[in-house]
């Protein structure tokens, strides 16, 4: 079966595993998914990510992060730019998520980055998702 939006599938898998407090999940790997997972790790939303080689495209194993009382670190994930409706932001229009409490993931010509990084580099791009 052909998947029309693999990034939305990855975000949905993370959201679902987070809701039932799973420790880890696996998603089919791709370059952009790997970059998104590394960004989520760097920003402290997930504990770890590892790439597992297989004879197809590879697998990303994502380890979710929870607080001291087992509260969720990720409270929300939302896909913004979709295959049917792409959303782009210029350098001076990069969105803020919850007044800086969350992050916006942008796909730019310089790679996938957060809204904060895009503002520092004065670059715009496709608004992939919001995470808070």
From Swiss-Prot:
<dbReference type="GO" id="GO:1990904">
    <property type="term" value="C:ribonucleoprotein complex"/>
</dbReference>
<comment type="subunit">
    <text>Part of the 30S ribosomal subunit. Contacts proteins S5 and S12.</text>
</comment>
<comment type="function">
    <text>One of the primary rRNA binding proteins, it binds directly to 16S rRNA central domain where it helps coordinate assembly of the platform of the 30S subunit.</text>
</comment>
<dbReference type="GO" id="GO:0005840">
    <property type="term" value="C:ribosome"/>
</dbReference>
<dbReference type="GO" id="GO:0003735">
    <property type="term" value="F:structural constituent of ribosome"/>
</dbReference>
<keyword id="KW-0689">Ribosomal protein</keyword>
<dbReference type="Pfam" id="PF00410">
    <property type="entry name" value="Ribosomal_S8"/>
</dbReference>
<dbReference type="GO" id="GO:0006412">
    <property type="term" value="P:translation"/>
</dbReference>
<comment type="similarity">
    <text>Belongs to the universal ribosomal protein uS8 family.</text>
</comment>
<dbReference type="InterPro" id="IPR047863">
    <property type="entry name" value="Ribosomal_uS8_CS"/>
</dbReference>
<dbReference type="InterPro" id="IPR000630">
    <property type="entry name" value="Ribosomal_uS8"/>
</dbReference>
<keyword id="KW-0699">rRNA-binding</keyword>
<keyword id="KW-0687">Ribonucleoprotein</keyword>
<dbReference type="GO" id="GO:0019843">
    <property type="term" value="F:rRNA binding"/>
</dbReference>
<protein>
    <recommendedName>
        <fullName>Small ribosomal subunit protein uS8</fullName>
    </recommendedName>
</protein>
<dbReference type="InterPro" id="IPR035987">
    <property type="entry name" value="Ribosomal_uS8_sf"/>
</dbReference>
<keyword id="KW-0694">RNA-binding</keyword>
């Amino acid at each position: 079966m052909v998947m029309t939006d693999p990034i939305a599938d990855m975000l949905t898998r993370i959201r679902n595993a987070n809701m039932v407090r799973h420790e880890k999940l696996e998603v089919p790997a791709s370059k952009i998914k790997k970059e998104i997972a590394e960004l989520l790790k760097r920003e402290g939303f997930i504990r770890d990510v590892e790439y597992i080689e297989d004879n197809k495209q590879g697998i990303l194993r994502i380890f979710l992060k929870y607080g001291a009382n087992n509260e969720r670190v990720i409270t929300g994930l939302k896909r913004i730019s979709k295959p049917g409706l792409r959303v782009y932001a210029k350098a001076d229009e990069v969105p803020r998520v919850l007044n800086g409490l969350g992050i916006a993931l942008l796909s730019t010509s310089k790679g996938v980055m957060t809204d904060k990084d895009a503002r520092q580099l004065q670059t715009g791009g496709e608004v992939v998702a919001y995470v808070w």
